[in-house]
Amino acid sequence: MLMPKRTKFRKQQKGQFAGLSKGATFVDFGEYAMQTLERGWVTSRQIEACRVAINRYLKRRGKVWIRIFPDKSVTKKPAETRMGKGKGAPDHWVAVVRPGRILFEVANVSKEDAQDALRRAAAKLGIKTRFVKRVERV
């Protein structure tokens, strides 16, 4: 699972989802990519499941880049615990994604293979995504 090596604070506030993605909106490394259409949290387990799905489909062909990192801790209180008594312990890590964010990039494979691999990975996520290809920027 992906998680930060160390953080300044163990617990974080929920934060806001408003607006579009501020960075990583273009295909910079590969030829094809998966781009978000919705906002939400992507957990480190979902990222790992997507990575495994892409790699299993491509079978050592091509190269894969993961463009998101789960750097936000999500806390959870134990089951059957009364309210109050402070915030719960850190439970898992998530990456905050907004519309337009590139999640995964693929290179050195055909368009059909890239589409199939990224479609299989998109099924592991709880947000809508689309397939995009690289466009030359000036």
UniProtKB/Swiss-Prot annotation:
PROSITE patterns noted in UniProt: RIBOSOMAL_L16_1, RIBOSOMAL_L16_2
Record's keyword annotation contains Flavoprotein: no
Purpose: Binds 23S rRNA and is also seen to make contacts with the A and possibly P site tRNAs.
Molecular function terms from GO: rRNA binding; structural constituent of ribosome; tRNA binding
Originating organism: Chlamydia pneumoniae
Pfam families the UniProt entry points to: Ribosomal_L16 (PF00252)
Superkingdom per UniProt: Bacteria
Name of the protein described by the UniProt record: Large ribosomal subunit protein uL16
Subunit structure of this chain's protein: Part of the 50S ribosomal subunit.
Record CDD domains: Ribosomal_L16_L10e
Organism taxonomic ancestry: Bacteria, Pseudomonadati, Chlamydiota, Chlamydiia, Chlamydiales
Gene3D superfamilies the UniProt entry points to: Ribosomal protein L10e/L16
